[in-house]
């Protein structure tokens, strides 16, 4: 029989069952399971087991609620039409599926867990909140920073997803979702507010580590590369002349984008011992708030915009990029540093953007309180504008990462590159879920 769970997931399930049985005084069953699974108290001690006591019940109630929701949805005509919609063409629509409210100050950032239905949000009051976006419930409040939380990202070594946060308190903190979001490490080193953090995908040629690297950007005008397993800063990158607002790694982890108040977009080769500037892109007329690499799925559309006869191969990275600025525009760039298109439509600062996993669309949010969808197959035409979704500036936007399943077994929880091209093809499933955070203190979930 083929195995549904990964070895790690199976181990977690076994521990949860043992903890549940122990909590309900089924000692003979506990002893039998511990013996059968070779999980003696020296390996799985009672203190650790206590953390697993309620996990099985939580999972069970989640399944029951999901079953009820599925039954309710199946009776709704709109849900039937939604399920028929191709994920590759899905775009968010109002009203939001959930309006999540618990923050007391503006939300600065959001981040999706790569596998589970968890989402994190960070606010001006140094608070991080963890939610279940599937059910619209607050799971926990995480405290540790002393000033505003400016960015969040999930990632890390395969099989051990971490949450990284950065703050105006000059630090980066690493939290362990598998251990009640315990703060396992604090990374000091920046000399001013840390604006952005992103885990760097594994697979970069020549990279000494795999899945352990984290990039950060700061108002101290540096980008730093960290090893999350040791907490050491491996590289400090200098080149910008003002506050660096955002960073974005390429899919193979070889390149990094950075942008900020000096109005430039910089492309770095971070696979080298001393990172090199490959390109400096100039054109925005105000601070650049956000940047992103275009996924290979968008190359065919962007190549047409760039006037290329043939799209770059899907195996290549760093071919096209996007930036959003306080000058109210979005610019699309090619690998030569040429601005191939300027998208005009927002009436205020562009705060965040994300490419649709299908590559056909680009989504953006702004201080004009709108979410805009741009069709890259139509020369970047704005084909949808969502108004009235928030009551104040929209500060953040994230798309739930797709679920990637290997041919053999598991869902890939690692933020990183699919396996080498020689390997069997992977099954990539688009999750039609986005989240937005706002100065109105609410986190809103849009889904199919």
From Swiss-Prot:
Per UniProt, subcellular location reads as: Cytoplasm, Cytoskeleton; Cytoplasm, Cytoskeleton, Spindle pole
Cellular component terms per the entry's GO annotation: cytoplasm; microtubule; microtubule associated complex; spindle pole; transferase complex
Q: What is this protein called?
A: Nuclear distribution protein PAC1
Q: Which UniProt keywords apply?
A: Cell cycle, Cell division, Coiled coil, Cytoplasm, Cytoskeleton, Microtubule, Mitosis, Repeat, Transport, WD repeat
What's the domain remark here? Dimerization mediated by the LisH domain may be required to activate dynein.
Gene coding for it: PAC1
Molecular function (GO) terms for this protein are:
dynein complex binding
Q: What is the lineage of its organism?
A: Eukaryota, Fungi, Dikarya, Ascomycota, Pezizomycotina
Its biological purpose is as follows: Positively regulates the activity of the minus-end directed microtubule motor protein dynein. May enhance dynein-mediated microtubule sliding by targeting dynein to the microtubule plus end. Required for nuclear migration during vegetative growth as well as development. Required for retrograde early endosome (EE) transport from the hyphal tip. Required for localization of dynein to the mitotic spindle poles. Recruits additional proteins to the dynein complex at SPBs.
Q: Which PANTHER family match?
A: WD REPEAT DOMAIN 5B (PTHR22847:SF637), WD40 REPEAT PROTEIN (PTHR22847)
List, alphabetically, the HAMAP family matched.
lis1
